[in-house]
A protein has these predicted regions:
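N-terminal Sec signal peptide and the immediately downstream disordered periplasmic leader
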Residues: 1-67, 73-78, 188, 237-238, ...
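Acidic, small-polar-rich N-terminal luminal/periplasmic segments of exported/outer-membrane proteins
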Residues: 35-164, 564
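Outer-membrane beta-barrel translocator/receptor signature
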Residues: 109-110, 122, 130-133, 139, ...
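Periplasmic-side early beta-strands and strand-to-turn transitions of outer-membrane beta-barrels
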Residues: 156, 164-166, 172-174, 186-285, ...
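Structural signature of Gram-negative outer-membrane beta-barrels, strongest in the C-terminal barrel
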Residues: 232-236, 370-373, 379, 383-387, ...
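Membrane-embedded beta-barrel scaffold of Gram-negative outer-membrane proteins
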Residues: 313-319, 324-340, 519, 525-531, ...
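Gram-negative outer-membrane beta-barrel transporters
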Residues: 371-381, 385, 461-467, 583-585, ...
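C-terminal beta-signal and adjacent terminal beta-strands/loops
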Residues: 585-587, 594, 735-741, 761-824
Length: 824
């Protein structure tokens, strides 16, 4: 029998939109009983929304302020089919049209984010939302008009820029009954008609997930400070430049919520250990029984994440008459730090499994474009894009192992062959040894990614017909490395654990699209669009040594999408509507499967090692070495329909309803899973073990790509009651999310009806506004995300620590607040 030690691989930290539907942009107090045109830059030129041949959601900065959108997780209330989550406090996950992305998978995102037209990461842009001009959500594959190809869509965020003719600005302050506050302001200071400055700032604090940590007697809490300065320079009528600097500092302590009865994880080790007899030690519990509504954590250690970012952005436009030459460039330096206890459910009471991860990185980006200025006839555009990201993630993490599922500080006898290879394994040592085998893991992960692309597109517009298409050729090079060192009772390294053949990758995809838009009447457009996108695969960070190549490196992903739509206005433009239907097919969808138990080769000491004897899932003890988050390719298909209706029935009533249906499924895919019971379907019944002959279990699935329902609906309205110079108003916001069953985590999620209500008074000329509000009016406390099983840690000699808890995220409880807003 081969004795093995369970080891834990380092889990690294890699690295919105209030896009409401169009109605939000219409909801301006006024006397006209009709909606107004919305101008978007989805196609890199200013166009009316109805003339754009794709499904686009829009929100202005004013709407973000009106609906108190301070947190990225609140944005999904404004756009059906969009899921924005941060389940761990250290990674923002975006899902659109049922297509999800986890930042830790190391690929380009499924939904690419652009901040002032420069690609950036969600950790930077979503952390501080303030002084925003407009946010646009572009649905469907994006492989032509912007530098990074994305299969699900793009989100563009444009901050407010200074004007050159008047002093103007705003200030807003919010406080809630649950310790939350948000203060933001922005103002423009023009020096003359050629030079102007805009200054903006934010301070924010809140309880994040509202979880109380029982062992530490503390609540989750986060604080964010940010400042932004934009200098506008217009030396001539033909040249305009904007230089922006933003500083961001965020510090969050977000404890992991637990759900379940708890347990007595320790065993009292008797003399009959070799016979497999373990007597539970009922004197020590992982914690009390906890329901979802308790908002409680039993995590004995902390969970602190910090983000410090400097971002410089330059944009310049030179009008040459017949064309416009545009440049955007940026330099970003970020430092992310995560300090946490990996034993989030307290499977080992009295022991903190610390993990300290530091991720500094630099990103330099530049794009040069030249496009024709003519609106009618044949237009064209060409561009070149370059981006490089560098940095080295360092990990200092406890990877200690335990002989038995007993108290870490206890002393117990072990089989004689553990200390003396010549001794028999069926006898115990005559003396006890420490139950803890102390090991510290040190990991260095250098990152070097270069992307260069060249694009060309043609556009014809005339007689109500617009045809646009083009191609983008990309060269993407990436170098991956993971250097592992073990220190303590087991020493090894430093050692490169990624095979040499998988460390370097170069991809040269050709992406693009074609769209046709036709105006049937002045108020009715029909369109059809095709898009092709590509994402490079990735090499897993700190993967267990010796696992198969398919678990280390993923292949590239390709996708083709087809969309048809209708956009129009009726009843003298009192009602606008959009309808879009789409179908998308993935070749090798890049997905991430979290918490997957694995078995790796070793030399008999339980340490994963290259060149060690092969695994035997039938006889290895313990049967697994730990859990890890693996990236994997799989075929998939997506199909659906999106509908929006926005209206202004009267001059003082705005109404919007939007719905999205997206059925995103794997296509008979074989994917990593936990199958302890050997049923061929995901389960965590009993002691962790591997089904089959591979390093992990595999399950055949036609399940969801994301932990999200197929259907989503949002609605919002504002009703105004003008009384001379003053206007009382009431606003409502509804987000409906039906329940669904998750095959991956074996859980039946309940439906959610999120209702936010706002009541307030607006002053003369809308110069000030005072609003009282309540979030989660119904006080629903529903599980929004749950782990696949109870927190467990395998001991070396066959027993298991079981916490009796599953990690969960629960919708935040009802919260009352007040907001004051002034404009000048």
């Amino acid at each position: 029998m081969r004795m093995k030690r369970a080891t834990r691989a380092a889990l690294l930290c890699a690295g919105v939109s209030a896009f409401a539907v169009p109605a939000l942009a219409y909801a301006q107090a006024g006397s006209e009983n009709s909606t107004s045109d919305i101008v978007v830059t989805a196609t890199r030129r200013a166009e009316n929304l109805k003339d754009v041949a794709m499904s686009v959601n829009v929100a202005t900065g004013e709407q973000l302020e009106k609906f108190n959108i301070f947190d990225v997780k609140d944005v999904q209330q404004l756009a059906p089919g969009l899921e924005l989550t941060n389940t761990t406090g250290r990674n923002n996950t975006t899902t659109l049209r049922g297509i999800t992305f986890d930042p830790d998978q190391g690929t380009d995102p499924a939904v690419q984010l652009y901040y002032n037209e420069i690609p950036t990461d969600a950790q930077t842009a979503f952390t501080a939302i303030y002084d925003i001009e407009q946010i646009e959500v572009l649905r469907g594959p994006q492989g032509l008009l912007r530098g990074i190809s994305a299969p699900a869509g793009s989100i563009t965020i444009r901050t407010r820029r200074p004007n050159f003719d008047q002093i103007e600005g705003y200030g807003q302050a919010t406080a809630t009954d649950r310790g939350g506050y948000n203060v933001q302001l922005g103002t423009t200071l023009p020096f003359n008609e050629n030079l102007s400055l805009r200054v903006a700032g934010l301070v924010d604090g809140n309880r994040i997930n509202h979880v109380y940590n029982i062992p530490r007697d503390k609540r989750s809490y986060g604080q964010t400070q940010s400042a932004r300065v934009t200098l506008g320079w217009r030396p001539t009528e033909n040249l305009t430049t904007y230089l922006t600097y933003q500083y961001l500092q965020a510090d969050n302590n977000q404890y992991t919520q637990s759900f379940g009865p708890g347990n007595t994880p320790f065993s009292a080790v008797p003399v009959a250990t070799l016979a497999g007899i373990f007597i539970p030690d009922t004197t020590v519990r992982s914690g009390p029984p906890l329901s979802a509504t308790d908002y409680a954590s039993v995590q004995e250690g902390g969970f602190r994440t910090r983000n410090r970012t400097h971002l410089i952005n330059l944009a310049a436009d030179l009008d040459l008459g017949w064309s416009t030459l545009s440049f955007v460039g940026a330099h970003q330096y970020s430092k992310l730090q995560t300090n946490r206890d990996l034993d989030t459910t307290n499977a080992i009471p009295g022991y903190i499994q610390y993990s300290n991860v530091v991720t500094p990185y630099k990103v330099d980006t530049g794009e040069l474009r030249l496009q024709s200025n003519n609106d009618e006839g044949l237009g064209w555009g060409v561009g070149a894009f370059y981006s490089r990201q560098t940095g080295t993630t360092t990990v200092n993490q406890d990877a200690s192992q335990f002989w038995y599922a007993a108290a870490p500080g206890s002393f117990n006898p072990v089989p004689g062959c553990i200390l003396d290879p010549t001794a028999p394994c069926d006898t115990l040592t005559p003396f006890p040894i420490p139950n803890t085998l102390a090991i510290r893991t040190l990991v260095d992960v250098p990152v070097n990614v270069k992307t260069a692309s060249f694009s060309a597109n043609l556009r014809y517009k005339g007689g109500g017909l617009t045809v646009e298409g083009g191609l983008r050729y990309t060269i993407r090079k990436q170098v991956d490395s993971t250097i592992l060192t073990l220190v303590g009772d087991v020493n090894s390294g430093p050692e490169e654990i990624i095979p040499a053949s998988l460390r370097r990758s170069t991809d040269k995809p050709l992406t693009g699209g074609l769209s046709v838009n036709y105006a049937l009447t002045d108020d009715l457009n029909v369109y059809a669009a095709y898009g092709h996108s590509f994402r490079s695969g990735s090499t897993g960070v700190s993967v267990p040594a010796g696992v198969s190549s398919d678990l280390i490196r993923t292949d590239p992903e390709k996708t083709d999408s087809y969309e048809v739509g209708l956009k129009g206005s009726v009843f003298d433009r009192k009602v606008n509507f959009t309808v879009a239907a789409f179908y998308q097919k993935f070749d090798g969808f890049l997905s991430r499967f979290t918490g997957i138990f694995y078995n790796c080769p070793d030399f008999g000491d339980g340490t994963c090692a290259l060149g060690a004897p092969p695994i035997d899932n039938a006889t290895d003890v313990p049967a697994t070495n730990g859990g890890f988050d693996f990236n994997y390719n799989a075929p998939a298909k997506v199909k659906g329909i999106e509908v929006t209706i926005d209206a202004r029935p009267t001059p003082n009533w705005d109404l919007n309803i939007a719905a999205s249906y997206a059925r995103a499924r794997f296509s008979n895919a074989l994917v990593p899973c936990n199958d302890f019971a050997g049923t061929g379907t995901p389960n965590q019944d009993g002691t962790p073990r591997i089904t089959g002959t591979g390093n992990v279990s595999f399950c055949r699935t036609n399940g969801r790509l994301a932990e999200a329902p197929d259907f989503g609906l949002t609605a919002n309205t504002e009703l105004r009651f003008p009384m001379g110079d003053y206007t009382p108003f009431i606003r409502g916001l509804l987000a409906y999310r039906p329940g669904f069953y998750s095959e991956r985590v074996q859980y039946d999620y309940r439906s959610r009806e999120q209702i936010n209500l706002f009541v307030g008074l607006r002053g003369p000329e809308s110069k000030w506004e005072l609003t009282g509000f309540v979030r989660n009016l119904l006080n629903q406390k529903r599980i929004s995300n749950i782990a696949g099983g109870e927190g467990q840690v395998n001991a070396l000699l066959g027993s298991t620590f079981n916490s009796g808890y599953r990690s969960v995220n629960v919708t935040v409880p009802r919260e009352f607040g007040i907001t004051a807003n002034v404009k000048w």
